[in-house]
Curated annotation (Swiss-Prot):
Name under which the protein is recorded: CASP-like protein 1C1
Lineage: Eukaryota, Viridiplantae, Streptophyta, Embryophyta, Tracheophyta
Record keywords: Cell membrane, Membrane, Transmembrane, Transmembrane helix
Organism for this UniProt entry: Arabidopsis thaliana (Mouse-ear cress)
Transmembrane segments: 8-28, 52-72, 81-101, 130-150
Membrane topology: Multi-pass membrane protein
Any Pfam family hit: CASP_dom
Amino acid sequence: MVKLTKRIGGLVLRLAAFGAALAALIVMITSRERASFLAISLEAKYTDMAAFKYFVIANAVVSVYSFLVLFLPKESLLWKFVVVLDLVMTMLLTSSLSAALAVAQVGKKGNANAGWLPICGQVPKFCDQITGALIAGFVALVLYVLLLLYSLHAVVDPFLLQKS
């Protein structure tokens, strides 16, 4: 019964992480807004910034990985390798989220020293979508940290319980 509960707990955690990464991916991909003032037209989209593209690619990789691991049989010998891949996915999410957060902060506040003006006043819907994608990405990251701890416990625990 305990093993079944652990298996279901891990499955629910993986499913939630998959959902959060997929949500971050979809919200970021659909972020686009066009604004016009005077004779100038401005279109903001995620492809304008390399950090946002990296965020999309990272969340796509994590989503595909999360989906595939959901179908891995519990008897598979690959579960020890899954722990390593969980760590890689956690690091990938961390780096992409931090890069996207830095760019989003500049978009929101600007940078007076560099002469960069904030754009969120002109394209608020775009900025709101970026914020939503970053929140979903942060949820995915937290879930992946928990998943990594869970995976480590599941793989290491049998070794600790063995009698010498």
